[in-house]
Swiss-Prot record:
Gene name in the database record: murA
Binding, phosphoenolpyruvate: 22-23
Major place of residence: cytoplasm
GO CC, any one term: cytoplasm
Source superkingdom: Bacteria
Name of this protein: UDP-N-acetylglucosamine 1-carboxyvinyltransferase
Subcellular location: Cytoplasm
Keywords: Cell cycle, Cell division, Cell shape, Cell wall biogenesis/degradation, Cytoplasm, Peptidoglycan synthesis, Pyruvate, Transferase
One Gene Ontology molecular-function label: UDP-N-acetylglucosamine 1-carboxyvinyltransferase activity
Known catalytic reactions: phosphoenolpyruvate + UDP-N-acetyl-alpha-D-glucosamine = UDP-N-acetyl-3-O-(1-carboxyvinyl)-alpha-D-glucosamine + phosphate
Xref: CDD domains: UdpNAET (cd01555)
Length: 422
């Protein structure tokens, strides 16, 4: 198992290239199961979750070829079977995304209940209910979802009680081969969903209401789609994290290959804290703040402040003057990084879903342990400003969603080593 050894308080300067968005790539990879045509996907990030999804598709019988480290050519023309087994699914919650496409195209599938970050309840019930609304019969037996629709899926209204990104994606993919019209009400509005819509539209699916909370899908009257090649959008969470590298170290950094509109909630908050930003069409440059003010954040669904940036801003709050308040409204149990930040000297108090951070605090290097994907990046951020040396353990969490984060910060001047645990 690897860990990162980080020397803190090293001056940083330079430019960072942002990778493709993991959270866009995963549903798009799953959606290739709907196609009987070869598809090329570009700008895939080299992260563990993407490799796991590629392996799952290969296990189902898809033909895969990596044309370069970030481009995958694949064909799901003839699959061996429609069973997503536990050993392939257990490490990644996004594997539930194969449910909709497998069911829609092959009328029956067996999908293991998924794994992934342990950050509270992420019920698959919403996915199952959506499939049932389209006419599927669902049984859960021995840890597997057994879904079948012998006569195929039929368009219907799907109302999500709670906004669900992966639930919306699964419903979209299933509806694309359902007979007639499906309406998804209370749909998630993330940019990653807009890109999935564009991908499905390239295969002939008619979708109205993209970027809104109500999607109207007219399914294609065929047994499969003819999906076209696609390039994955930049990762807005990696972009936000790299801006926080500049913010927490109070450095001048330029973040390239981004879509600034996708991270407006993040840039608005950085400006409020005191950072001058130069926002261009596909880059943002952050400059040192004269004074970093405390702030308040409440996580919300897109376009609100993303829950996936909450941990990074908690690390940043330790360097801001005054009392910052972070309220987490989307997941319970998502403050596990707080106790690890406290090991570095952070002054944080927790009350249910609200964290209060008093700053500014001088952090001191220590051994800390990553508990989930975004928490791991928060610990890296804190270690960059801590006095002395920190070691961040269990970075397999980090590798699930960040492509070579240590290489990217080292290119800015940081001193980060990836080492093996003894």
């Amino acid at each position: 198992m690897d860990f990162l050894e980080i020397v803190g308080q090293v001056p940083l300067k330079g430019e960072v290239e942002i990778s493709g968005a993991k959270n866009s790539a995963l549903p798009i990879l799953a959606a290739t199961l709907l196609s009987h045509q070869e598809v090329k996907i570009k700008s895939l990030p080299q992260v563990v979750d993407i490799k796991a999804m590629a392996l799952l598709l290969q296990n189902l019988g898809a033909e895969l070829e990596w044309l370069n480290p970030h481009t995958l050519q694949l064909s799901a023309k003839s699959l061996h079977h429609t069973e997503a087994t536990y050993d392939l699914v257990r490490k990644m919650r996004a594997s539930i995304l194969v449910l909709g496409p497998l069911l829609a195209r092959f009328k029956e599938c067996l999908v293991s209940l998924p794994g992934g970050c342990a950050i509270g309840a992420r019920p698959v019930d919403l996915h199952l209910k959506a499939m049932q609304q389209l006419g599927a019969e669902i049984k859960i037996e021995q840890g597997y979802i057994h879904a079948k629709a012998p006569k195929g899926l039929k368009g219907n209204d799907i109302l999500f009680d709670k906004i669900s990104v992966t639930g919306t994606e699964n419903a979209l993919m299933a509806a694309s081969l359902a007979k007639g019209i499906t309406r998804i009400i209370n749909a998630a509005k993330e940019p990653e969903i807009a890109q999935l819509c564009a991908f499905l539209q390239s295969g002939g699916v008619e979708i109205e209401g993209v970027d809104s909370s109500e999607l109207k899908i007219r399914g294609v009257e065929s047994d499969a789609l003819n999906l076209k090649d696609i390039q994955i959008i930049p990762d807005r969470i990696e972009a936000g994290t790299c801006l926080c590298v500049g913010a927490i170290t109070n450095s001048q950094l330029k973040i390239n290959h981004i879509i600034p509109n996708h991270i407006q909630a993040i840039t608005d908050k950085l400006i409020e804290i005191g950072f001058p930003l130069d926002i261009q069409e596909n880059s943002i440059e952050i400059y040192p703040a004269k004074k970093r003010q405390a702030f308040e954040i409440t996580t919300k669904e897109y376009p609100g402040f993303p829950t996936d940036m909450q941990a990074q801003f908690m690390a940043l709050a330790t360097q801001c003057l005054g009392t910052s308040i972070i309220e987490e409204t989307l997941f319970e149990n998502r403050f596990m990084h707080a106790s690890e930040l406290q090991r570095l000297g952070a002054n944080i108090s927790l009350k249910t879903n609200v964290a209060t951070i008093s700053g500014s605090t001088e952090l001191t290097g220590s051994d800390v342990m990553a508990t989930d994907l975004r928490a791991s990046s928060a610990l890296v951020l804190a270690a960059l400003v801590a006095k002395g040396v920190s070691r961040v353990h269990r970075i397999y969490h980090l590798d699930r969603g960040y492509e070579r984060l240590e290489d990217k910060v080292n290119a800015l001047g940081a001193k980060v080593l990836r080492l093996k645990e003894k």
